[in-house]
Amino acid sequence: MEAGRPDSITREKLEVLKRHKIPRISINPQTMQQKTLDLIGRKHTVGDILRVYGMARELEFENINMDLIAGLPGETVEDVKDTLRQIEELSPDSITVHSLAVKRASRLAQMPELKEAALQEERGRQMEAMIDLAAESAARMGMKPYYLYRQKNIAGNFENVGYAKVDKAGIYNILIMEEKQSIVAVGAGASTKAVFSAAEDQLKNGQPGKEVKLEKRIERVENVKDVGQYIARIDEMIERKGELLWH
C-alpha cells in the first residue's frame, strides 16, 4: 500500500495500517537532496523521510519499499550517489527506480526550461549512469530486479525497475503490469479496474461450460476528480463500483 508522501504520513495512519495487517508499504522520497525536493515542489523534507521511515520500523513494518527518480532537474550523478548512500543506510526491503517522466499536471511540465533540459541527449547519458548506479546499490543491499515497465514521456526512453530482497517482491506490481489484477480505488480521481476472465463472464451470464474463446475483459469506473463532488456523491461512487465488481 502507498503510505503516502512523507509529509502526509502520521503515526496514527501507520498504526491503522498495522492494525489491519497491511504487509507492505511504500514510503517514497524520490530523492534525498533537499534542493531538488524544493525545486520540484515537494512539500516534504529529507528529515520527514528519515522520521517516517524510523517510525514505520518502530511499528515493526517488515516490508518497506522506497521509490526513487533518476534524472530529476538539476541533479548530478554525484547527487544520485549521495541519495543511494543514504538509502543504503536505511536498508529498505525493496526500491523502485523510476526514470523521469514529465507528466502534464506536474510542476515540472509548467517549467519549460527545466523540462527541455531534462530531455536533452546529454541528460540521457547522465541518466544511464544514474540508473546503473541504482542497480549496483540495489545489489549491495541484497536486492534483485523483479519487474520492469515503461510509461509515456520518459526521458531517454529508459524504464522503471523494481528491486527487492528475497521474499519481499511486490507481486501486485507484476500482476498490474500483466493486466491480471482488479483494483478497487478509493478517493477523488481514483480509477477502479475490474479484470474478468472468460470463465467469470460465462458464470455471470448464466452459461457455465459453454465453449468460448478464452479472452479477458477489462472495465473501469472513474471517481469524480473534484473533492467536494466526490464527498457529495460518495454513495453514487460506491454504487458504481458495486455494479461493476459484484453484480
Residue ranges and their predicted role:
Residues 1-134:
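Conserved non-cysteine loop/helix-boundary elements of the Radical SAM core domain that shape
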Residues 28, 63-65, 153, 157-160, ...:
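Detector for Asparagine
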Residues 36, 77, 106, 157, ...:
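Generic domain-boundary/flexible-linker signal
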Residues 44, 83, 87, 114, ...:
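Residue-level signature of transmembrane alpha-helix interfaces in integral membrane proteins
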Residues 49, 94, 142-145, 226:
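A general marker of short, structured functional hotspots
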Residues 101, 152, 190:
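Glycine-rich beta-alpha junction loops
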Residues 105-186:
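A C-terminal junction/extension of Radical SAM enzymes
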Residues 162-247:
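Radical SAM enzyme core and accessory elements
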